[in-house]
Amino acid sequence: MRGRMALKKSGIICELREVLLRKKPEAMILISPKGTVPILQLKDESVLDESLHIMRWALNIRDPDNWLEKIDESEALIVELDQVFKKDLDRYKYFVRYPEHPQVYYRVLGEKFLVMLEERLIKNHGKGLSNTRTTFSDIAVFPFVRQYAFVDKTWFDQTPYSFLKIWLTQHIESELFLSVMHKVPPWKLGDEILFVGITPDC
């Protein structure tokens, strides 16, 4: 979703093809044999197959809200997200696949990242992770915090991370996020073309 949000914000119009990962279309594998999502094929037929790369590509073309400001200061946070927290999140969500520890063990590992986010938000008066407004790091991070929170929403709601909970709610309820969350049927050859990025200034 973070890649799609950046495309929407930048106003770059792309053809949207929703896929079921358990039934990957041949056209997808031909474009990117890695077989993971998201995938963005550019006009020159080069391929971006990491959401962060898609975000940077789109925002380097058009960045109406200056999300890329202080991007260098966000690198450590994003590395921690992608290399540590996402692994902890995966184990927390799918703990039955990792029976060497109970689910709460993986929750505690992921909670360390929440503590760091809360500290950043306190520093920025609750407005953002890297600035006193929404920037690249907020959009890159919040979809994964959302996933973590909804594994056990009752537990998350009683945590002491008040700034984090408000920040997360604001992003979940934002017009931009809601605009890219609508469900579309899985793509198949011959389908009517759907687009993302038509409205540039959400």
What kind of region is each of these model predictions?
Residues 119-131, 176-181:
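Surface-exposed helix-capping loop/turn segments at secondary-structure junctions
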Residues 100-105, 153-159:
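Acidic, serine/threonine/proline-rich low-complexity intrinsically disordered regions
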Residues 68-73, 178-188:
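Short, flexible loop/turn segments with low-complexity composition
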Residues 129-154, 160:
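GST superfamily/GST-like fold recognition
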Residues 116-121, 148-151:
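Alpha-helical transmembrane segments in multipass membrane proteins, preferentially the mid-helix core
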Residues 184-202:
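Acidic/histidine-enriched, glycine/proline-rich intrinsically disordered or flexible terminal extensions
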Residues 105-113, 159-173:
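Extended, well-ordered alpha-helical scaffold segments
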Residues 1-115, 123-127, 198:
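GST-like domain detector, emphasizing the conserved glutathione-binding G-site
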